[in-house]
Amino acid sequence: ENYVEAAHTFRNRPDLWKKIEEGALSSNAAMREGTQHMLSTFKKNPKKYTPENIEHIDMKFGKALDDICPNCRYDVKFREGQKPLFEEFKSYNSETWSKIANDKGFIKQFESYLQEVNKLEDLAYMINSNKANINEVKQAFKELFKKEADNLFRFPEEGGLGLEKIRKLFGRDIKNTSDFLDKAEDINNPIYNFIKTN
């Protein structure tokens, strides 16, 4: 597949062009693959991914599970008023997805997104459907929610999201951890709508 055309759209934005070029020419295979995944998504939806709509692109990879980023930065941040506000491109295979519930770096990154957004539709995890099935990914997040529910419900000053924020993101009908876990049990519940395929 040719991504040059999608990349060239950003020539007039040197800040974005530089990030795309860095990713595409990286000696790190996972970073190159992640950049291709992002560009192939850009190519499929050129009206959404315009230089005018994107505020920032940031692809940082660290030494963690399948290069999960330890410094918790988004891949694409859209300008205020765009939906979503943040997109995180994940080119993981099924095996890697199955490990996210036990990966502190992944959990920390996900929680930092949840703290950053006001509505769940402000966040999208763009998965590479050539490497994993969306239901496998939802299942992996279900395990993460089950494992992390108590931490998410902690007060913000204790590192959690707190009940108010959870209700804002996942539904006003949530009164406690058990309500949240009931929703998480069904991978077709709207709480999983932030998981998208390209």
Q: What kind of region is each of these model predictions?
A:
Residues 8-11, 15, 26-29, 33, ...:
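Alpha-helix boundary/N-cap detector
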Residues 2-68:
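Acidic-basic catalytic patches of nuclease active cores, encompassing PD-(D/E)XK
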Residues 66-89:
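Active-site beta-strand-loop-beta-strand hairpin of nuclease catalytic cores
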Residues 83-84, 89-154:
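Catalytic cores of nucleic-acid endonucleases
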Residues 147-198:
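Non-catalytic C-terminal interaction segments of nucleic acid-processing enzymes
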Residues 6-13, 22-27, 41-45, 116, ...:
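Surface-exposed polar/charged interaction patches
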Residues 62-66, 74-75, 110-114:
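Short secondary-structure capping micro-motifs at structural edges
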Residues 47-60, 122-131, 152-161:
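Short glycine-rich, low-complexity/disordered patches
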